[in-house]
A protein has these predicted regions:
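Core beta-strand-centered patch of the WYL/Sm-like small regulatory domain
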Residues: 4, 109-223
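Well-ordered beta-strand positions
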Residues: 66, 158-159, 246-248
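Short, hydrophobic/amphipathic alpha-helical patches that form generic packing surfaces
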Residues: 7-15, 92-95, 269-272
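Polybasic (Lys/Arg-rich)
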Residues: 208-301
Length: 301
């Protein structure tokens, strides 16, 4: 199973992402053959197959592998090394390769027991995005506890906090909307095509300063403190790409700075470590959190 094409492509991407300075053709081919051998699947990697695989990394995975003639090596395009798509591909592949070493799901791998996350819609939505076709579906609104019919132009699939969303806009509208896949039902692709000037760069820019999926707030400088334990968690798994996390002078906690939109999702993230978090600035955020905690105390006494 490991010797199929998609596995070879992902092995190459993994090798190049771990060796950003680049690898020679010989090094890549030997590493691929070694990977197969470890899985008891001997594979004789031919030069022609290698050349085809390098080309197919771009065609099938949308990633550019550059040949550096001066140093006689191959590298991932520098613009894509930190791409979250690469991380998604490789993380999925690492789980996959661990699983195929066993006949079926081994007992020592324990997945989280949670309800469906809507991934059954993933391929349908992805195909509609590629074909630029409208989608129509029923959507459950949490705030009003009702189902509404939605018709959208789908532009992208975006992951946030272990949930997937389809990003798009309504017909004759240009403002971006996000719809959780886990709240979608009766999904159908319509025959109607759409045109748009919105691209992935536009969408990435739209969410650049936000945490999770809420947007449309102004960007502010936020300073917070955590104790040592929570600070280490936040340091290892940053809240936002703008995060700067520094150990305080006493080495008893962390000072964290962010440049971010203060949205409901961000506030909920701060509340998830309520026993430790201390907001330094802005003052309105400090007061807002204090009010939430005061109201919670009233409800729970």
């Amino acid at each position: 199973m490991l010797s199929n094409k998609i596995s070879r492509l992902l092995i190459i991407v993994n090798l190049l992402s771990e060796n950003r300075e680049g690898l020679s053709k010989t090094d890549i081919m030997k590493a691929v053959e070694k990977k197969f051998a470890l899985q008891n699947e001997p594979f004789d990697y031919k030069d022609l197959a290698f050349k085809r695989d390098i080309k197919d990394v771009r065609i099938d995975l949308g990633l550019e592998v550059i040949y550096d003639r001066k140093h006689d090596c191959y590298r991932l395009c520098s613009l894509e090394v930190d791409d979250s798509r690469v991380e998604l591909l490789l993380n999925s592949f690492k789980v996959f390769t661990a699983l195929i070493q066993h006949s079926g799901l081994p007992e020592h791998i324990i997945p989280e027991k949670r309800k469906s996350n809507g991934l059954e819609h993933f391929s349908t939505i992805s195909e509609a995005i590629g074909l630029k076709k409208y989608l129509e579906f029923q959507y459950f609104k949490y705030d009003i506890n009702q189902i509404e019919i939605k018709k959208i132009k789908p532009f992208a699939l975006k992951e946030s906090k272990n949930r997937w969303y389809v990003i798009g806009c309504y017909e004759n509208k240009t403002d971006l909307r996000a719809f959780g896949l886990d709240r979608i039902s009766n999904l159908s692709t319509l025959g109607q095509h759409y045109k748009t000037k919105i691209n992935i760069a536009t969408i990435n820019k739209y969410y650049e300063d936000s945490f999770a999926m809420f947007t449309n707030e102004k960007v502010e400088n936020v300073k917070i403190r955590y104790d040592l334990r929570d600070g280490n968690y936040v340091k290892s798994y940053p809240i936002h790409h703008s995060q700067v996390c520094e150990l305080n002078d006493e080495k008893t906690g962390y000072n964290v700075s962010l440049k971010i939109q203060i949205t409901l999702d961000f506030i909920m993230e701060l509340m998830s470590r309520a026993w430790s978090v201390e907001v330094i600035e802005p003052l309105h955020l400090k007061e807002y959190l204090a009010k939430i905690f005061e109201d919670a105390q009233v409800r729970n006494t």
